[in-house]
Structures are given as structure tokens and as C-alpha cells.
């Protein structure tokens, strides 16, 4: 048995392949290539199963609502995530990973590297958020997201871990 290391496919090569072989528009192919981070299998699953991108859209809309909402909404969301966690541990960890990528994009824009944004279909919203939040608080939130994933994997109380996470969501410091 030999371990085989595979490198991610380049974004340009994947975009071309998806346009030519799967008749996607350039924009659709570019989005899938960016979101897949070079994993062709993920991009092909997203083409076959439309719910993958639909669920992502729904989760990102929830994220924006939670960020804009107050503590009451955030704690209610933590309660919903706790119930979901008890049914599907991996789905909540994947959601936290999506949040990490989202806030990473906010940081990338704050640092002036728009070409590195992963969620290119939400570029306008991300740019707005990059101007509304303090970068140190965003960094702290990303750290807390990573810690929350770790705590949940280590069997911490999910409700407590998720409520602590909600407290780490930064407050807007500027209006767009």
C-alpha cells in the first residue's frame, strides 16, 4: 500500500474543464473552481447535486442575519445549532468551516487582496463587511471559530461552546 499525494487542480484549469466538459458558464465554472479549492471531485458533486450550493447560500444568509441580529437572535441560533449538532455533528463542523472561510474573506479584503476571496459570489457583501468591522475582532472571531470546532470534536457541551462563539461575533464599528 502506497500513499499517493495529489495536488489541487489549478483554478484556471478547473474552470476550463468545467466550461468545456460540463457546459457551465464561465461565471458558474469560476465560482465552483474557487469554492472547490482545487478539488475536482467537490466541484463535480456540486454540479450533480444542486442542494450543495443551495445549502451554502442558505447558511451564508443565516450567517448575515446572525451577524446583524442582537444577542437574543444569536443565542437562539446557538440553540438551533445545538439541536442540529446532536443530530448531525459533521454538518455543524462543516458550517463552522464555512464561517471560517467567510471571515477569512473579510480579512483578505481588509488587507487589500481581493483576488484571494473565495466567496466571489458574495464579493459586494464581503467588501461592505470589511469596512464595517475591526480587523482585530475578526481575527479573534476566526480563532474562536477554530477553537469551537476543536471543543466540539473534544466532546465539550455543544450549547455552551456555541453560545461562547456567538459572544465572539464582532459588533459593527463603522457603517458602510
Residue ranges and their predicted role:
Residues 2-98, 103, 109-118, 122-176:
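Charged, glycine-rich active-site and insertion segments that engage polyanionic ligands
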Amino acid at each position: 500500500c502506497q500513499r499517493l499525494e495529489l495536488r489541487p487542480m489549478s483554478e484556471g484549469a478547473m474552470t476550463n474543464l468545467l466550461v468545456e466538459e460540463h457546459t457551465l458558464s464561465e461565471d458558474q465554472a469560476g465560482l465552483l473552481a474557487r469554492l472547490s479549492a482545487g478539488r475536482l471531485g467537490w466541484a463535480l458533486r456540486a454540479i450533480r447535486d444542486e442542494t450543495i450550493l443551495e445549502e451554502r447560500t442558505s447558511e451564508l444568509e443565516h450567517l448575515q442575519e446572525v451577524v446583524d441580529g442582537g444577542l437574543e437572535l444569536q443565542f437562539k441560533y446557538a440553540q438551533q445549532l445545538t439541536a442540529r449538532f446532536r443530530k448531525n455533528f459533521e454538518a455543524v463542523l462543516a458550517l463552522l468551516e464555512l464561517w471560517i472561510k467567510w471571515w477569512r474573506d473579510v480579512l483578505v479584503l481588509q488587507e487589500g487582496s481581493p483576488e484571494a476571496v473565495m466567496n466571489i459570489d458574495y464579493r459586494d457583501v464581503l467588501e461592505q463587511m470589511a469596512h464595517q468591522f475591526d480587523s482585530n475582532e475578526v481575527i479573534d472571531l476566526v480563532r474562536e471559530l477554530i477553537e469551537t470546532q476543536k471543543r466540539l470534536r473534544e466532546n465539550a457541551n455543544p450549547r455552551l461552546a456555541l453560545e461562547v462563539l456567538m459572544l465572539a461575533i464582532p459588533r459593527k464599528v463603522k457603517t458602510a
